Amino acid sequence: MQFVGDIRKLLQRDPLDEDAAARLWGAILDEALDDIELGAVLGALTASSATREELMGLYRAAQERMDRAPLLAGARAVAIPAYGLVPGEALMASLAAALLARFEVPVAVHGILDSPCGVSSACVLRELGVLPCASLALAGESLRTERITFIPAQLLGARFASLIALRGRLGVEGPAHLVAQVLDPTNAGAVRLSFSVAGTASEQLETLATQIDGDFVALTWPAGRSPSSLSTRPRIESIRDGSREVLFEADVQEMRTAIPQPPEDAQGMARWIKRVMAGAIPVPVPAVNLVAACLYAVGHAPDFTQAKAIAAVSAGRLAA
């Protein structure tokens, strides 16, 4: 009966403050609520209707309970979320992971194995030889030796992963899908990527990222675009402890490009990425820009100008 009042407020859409939301989400993650109470909470809160305070409450509850992959001291990783929140994210997530690993930047992709809105990053990475890790210890070892790993959401927290899995039954994204984007799956303060599209529920990520300590590289595509559109650069921002810096503005229209559009299936995407990595296909400009932003964020360059130069020179060498 402890949370009856909070649940009643949610059903009436009287928003909870952050502390109350953290207590309620904590109870959910601790399996202290029964199925009827859980259903009431999830019925009242979709990804688009949850307030910033309610999302921050879930973030706090998840952070306190999640497990993390070990990372060697001094190694700054990039964490890439892969939860199917943004259609087409698998292409950009997988390509970014492959490119960053070339720079010896550890990349921890974390998310779901199958996406309800198209090909999942896990499927593309599997075709690239990156298999889902069976444990966080193995994930840490992969980060050390291979510089890239895929961490299933289940390893970070079984109960949190079960909230994400409910999308298949509810038909809509819940608050967990948004919060998953800003989680750090490592124990060493990774730079976190976030993907969002203007005019969708994912747009709340910009506000959420500014409320959380740590570093983010936030990508926002214009309305109607997606990460699979390699002819349109998203707005790319660096967010450091809530302070925002625009690194690249979004393209207002599609760029003309001779780069062939990748296939839409996992095997085809993986083949296309392999051709990019082999220099047979030029690195798309949005991907070069993203790499530059990440190199800047993890400290692989003393300033952003040099980060852009390093990324551009590397892209040119691949194509040479």
What label would you give each PLM region?
Residues 9, 15-16, 58, 63-73, ...:
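Glycine-rich anion-binding loops and their surrounding alpha/beta cores
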Residues 43-46, 101-102, 292-300:
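Short glycine/serine- and small hydrophobic-enriched flexible loop segments
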Residues 83-86, 113-117, 222-223:
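Acidic, glycine-rich active-site loops and adjacent beta-strand->loop/helix elements
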Residues 1, 10-53, 69, 282-289:
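N-terminal glycine-rich anion-binding loops that anchor highly charged ligand groups
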Residues 30-31, 79-90, 194-197, 278:
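Short, glycine-rich nucleotide/cofactor-binding loops
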Residues 27-30, 44, 50, 55, ...:
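Short, structured segments at the rim of ligand-binding sites
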Residues 90-139, 144:
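A glycine-rich phosphate/pyrophosphate-binding beta-strand-loop-alpha-helix module
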Residues 49-108:
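Active-site cofactor/substrate anionic-group-binding motifs, chiefly glycine-
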